[in-house]
Design a protein with these regions (language model features):
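Mg2+/Mn2+-dependent nuclease catalytic core
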Residues: 106-156
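General structural signal for secondary-structure boundaries
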Residues: 11-15, 81-86, 154
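Accessory terminal regions of nucleic-acid processing enzymes
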Residues: 1, 53, 57, 153
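Generic start-of-chain signal for non-secretory N-termini
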Residues: 1-11
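A non-catalytic, helix-rich entry segment at domain boundaries
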Residues: 43, 47-121
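Nuclease catalytic cores
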Residues: 10-60
Length: 156
């Protein structure tokens, strides 16, 4: 269980920034030295990812109900916690569970990864990203991306 997403490193040539650096290569050099400032919207989205990871740890990674409840009480004190966010995350987790069960129906040998760092250096030097949920079973690969927050429209 990793959970602290706010201190993650960011790749210079990230997958999420590919539209910009592919269409405007000079932007890579131009952005060097500029601090990566977060916004409340990004922080809220990061919190949603951390909360979803807590749920996945309970469902798939052996976190006990006691440990979940204790951690969840701490999450409820976070400035970004709201019932709306909790409901959104629970809906996302339910969707992932549905996809996981579909994968099990194809093949009992399911690979499921949650909030996993992906090395993309083979394709773009020094590039990496995070796979929110990756499910592989019976020759089918599903990549599920959590989008939460406000302020900037994101296409996924």
């Amino acid at each position: 269980m990793k959970l602290d997403h706010s201190n993650r490193a960011h790749a210079k040539l990230s997958a999420s920034g590919a539209k910009q650096w592919l269409n405007c290569p000079p932007s890579i050099k131009a952005s060097e030295g500029i601090a990566d400032k977060s916004t409340v919207f990004a922080e809220e989205g990061t919190f949603a990812h951390e909360l979803s990871e807590l749920y996945f740890s309970l469902k798939y990674e052996g976190l006990t109900q006691f440990e979940f409840n204790k951690a969840f009480q701490n999450y409820k004190r976070n400035q970004y916690y709201s019932e709306e966010l909790r409901e959104y995350v629970e809906e996302y987790v339910a969707n992932v569970e549905e996809k996981y069960n579909e994968a099990l129906s194809r093949d009992n040998d399911v690979i499921a990864l949650f909030e996993t760092k992906l090395d993309l250096g083979k394709y773009v030097p020094e590039s990496f990203g995070t796979g929110d949920v990756i499910i592989f079973s019976g020759g089918v690969l599903e990549i599920i991306d959590l989008k939460y927050g406000k302020g900037i429209e994101v296409s996924a």
